[in-house]
From Swiss-Prot:
PANTHER family to which the protein is assigned, alphabetical: CTP SYNTHASE, CTP SYNTHASE-RELATED
Gene that specifies this protein: pyrG
Protein name: CTP synthase
Subunit text: Homotetramer.
Domain Glutamine amidotransferase type-1: start-end pairs: 294-532
Organism: Methanosphaera stadtmanae (strain ATCC 43021 / DSM 3091 / JCM 11832 / MCB-3)
GO molecular function annotations of the record: ATP binding; CTP synthase activity; glutaminase activity; identical protein binding; metal ion binding
Gene3D superfamilies: 3.40.50.880, P-loop containing nucleotide triphosphate hydrolases (3.40.50.300)
Length: 534
């Protein structure tokens, strides 16, 4: 039987509920507990696939092809697990399921209401994940802030969940923010008190309060919060701003979060001590300041780093694996893009994206890397930019993608045939994990040390097979394909120190303890370039 830890948030949004959930999960995993995680997003969208990255950040893709909230990326990286798309519950999914059941007559003529039908569906979705994963503990993060009208059905559902599962099988962790007023030189606990009061007014008494803050809170402040929020002082946990998000599990473990939760939920473990040695080593490796490599991410949505959060984290993982510090600069690939700015970098990365804006800047960045032997890594749209650049530099100046010019006379990149028949936008791309066959003697093979891999995809466009010969005659190496050789999955370039583009998204499979092979190889190449310049 699974036990549930529900994480709610108060005071402000983006407070760190996802990192808190992931950190608690990491701590429990280090005790040998089987943990999974769920993210509840209280928006009416069915999934994250059509959301603006400027507003919502990265769209994370699971193996089973669900477009999800970026917090699932935190869960997978911290817990080192592969989650199902069912781990992302949205209001859209809940209402769609309830309406479908109503149309089928499954409610036997009842007046369908928020309570009990919507709340029952929410609980069913949570329990289905628990049953499928056989997890001992299920982390359930409720998105938004306590008091939001959108979150109310979910708050009511998890309140009911605790009553039905029992006190020993469900607990609540409330994440709040304790602001520091520099003028007064003091912390203010009133927002935390009011947020907890709001939660208790909805029928939920938190078992633990996690206080986010810029600086560390002293014992007197913790005692004050414990007194006014009616929790034991040992259940008031402070997580001040850290050098790295990967430090948070260590901070929480040092505050005895693990033992408190194990006792609160009556969980028996094979050991009384968590094994966080490997995690501690990762944190130390991430603190390395020298040697240093500079990487430019030439992208479209660079104003919000969360739009490329998995790429950022993957670069950090690869830096730790190569014992170097990775300095990341975010370069906007717009019309006024100055190519000379790239001279200072040891490597370039062209991330995925959609639409024409910024594509010319990305193509020019690829050409710069080709002409100057700079290591360059292209992901999804990055592979498209690489293919177009190779063609343009080798006698096909009009090379383009039909994504940007439907009437292109040299469509090196074209929409996949099966995609041309699709009208709906959401959930209709080539999504999820697909196998890839790697050619021996290539950079890809050197990185993976395998000829058969699986990676996650999110795209509608591919290299046009009619232009394969043109690309290979220009020095391109097709180093990865679908098992039937029909789809180009990876491309490299002869006589270049490190030039690799992939149609898939390797950033979704990188872990702090297992840097993705391609990112690891890319950073190694950037490190070599810097060393050879000395």
């Amino acid at each position: 039987m699974s036990k549930y830890i529900v994480v709610t948030g108060g005071v402000v949004s983006s407070i760190g509920k996802g990192i808190t959930s992931a950190s608690i999960g990491r701590i429990l995993r280090s005790y040998g507990v089987n943990v999974t995680a769920i993210k509840i997003d209280p928006y009416l969208n069915w999934d994250s696939g059509t959301l603006n990255p400027y507003q919502h950040g990265e769209v994370y893709v699971t193996d089973d092809g669900m477009e999800c909230d970026l917090d699932l990326g935190h869960y997978e990286r911290f817990l080192d697990v592969e989650l199902s798309g069912k781990a992302n519950i949205t209001t859209g999914k809940v209402y769609s399921s309830v309406i479908e059941k109503e149309r089928k007559g499954e409610y036997l003529g009842s007046c369908v209401q928020i309570i009990p039908h919507i709340t029952d569906e929410i609980k069913l979705m949570i329990r289905n994940v628990a049953e499928k994963t056989k997890a001992e503990v299920v982390m359930v993060e409720v998105g938004g802030t306590v008091g939001d009208i959108e979150s109310q059905p979910f708050i009511e559902a998890v309140r009911q969940l605790k009553n039905e599962e029992g006190h020993d099988n469900c607990m609540f962790v409330h994440v709040t923010y304790v602001p520091y007023l520099k003028a007064a030189k003091e912390f203010k606990t009133k927002p935390t008190q009011h947020s907890t009061k709001e939660l208790r007014g909805l029928g939920i008494n938190p078992d633990m309060i996690v206080c986010r803050s810029e600086l560390s809170l002293d014992a007197n402040l913790k005692e004050k919060i414990a007194h006014f929020c009616d929790v034991p002082i040992e259940a008031v946990i402070n997580t001040p701003d850290a050098h790295s998000i990967y430090e948070v599990p260590l901070i929480m473990y040092s505050a005895n979060v693990g033992s408190y939760i194990l006792n609160r939920l009556n969980i028996d473990t094979a050991t009384n001590k968590a094994d966080l040695y490997e995690w501690s080593q990762i944190v130390e490796d991430l603190k390395i300041e020298t040697p240093k490599v500079k990487i430019a991410v030439v992208g479209k949505y660079i104003e919000l780093e969360d739009a490329y959060i998995s790429i950022r984290e993957s670069l950090k993982h690869a830096g730790a694996a190569n014992k170097v510090h990775v300095d990341i600069d975010w370069i906007k690939a717009d019309n006024d893009f100055n190519i000379d700015i790239l001279k200072q970098y040891d490597g370039l990365l062209i991330p995925g994206g959609f639409g024409e804006r910024g594509i010319n800047g990305k193509i020019e960045a690829v050409k710069y890397a080709i002409k100057n032997n700079v290591p360059i890594f292209g992901i999804c749209l990055g592979l498209h930019a690489m293919s177009i650049a190779i063609a343009q530099l080798n006698g096909y100046p009009d090379a383009n993608s039909t994504e940007f010019d439907e009437n292109s006379t040299c469509p090196v990149i074209d929409m996949m045939e099966e995609q041309k028949k699709i009208n709906n936008m959401g959930g209709t791309m080539r999504l999820g994990a697909y196998p890839c066959k790697i050619k021996e003697g290539t950079l890809a093979y050197e990185a993976y040390k395998d000829t058969n891999i699986s990676e996650r995809h999110r795209h509608r466009y591919e290299v046009n097979n009619e232009y394969r010969d043109i690309l290979t005659s220009a020095g391109a190496i097709i180093s990865g394909t679908s098992p039937d050789d029909f789809l180009v999955e990876m491309i490299e370039l002869e006589n270049h120190p490190w030039f690799l583009g992939c149609q898939f998204h390797p950033e979704f499979k990188s872990r702090p303890n297992k840097a993705h092979p391609l990112f690891k190889s890319f950073i190694k190449a950037a490190k070599n370039k810097k060393q050879n310049q000395k």
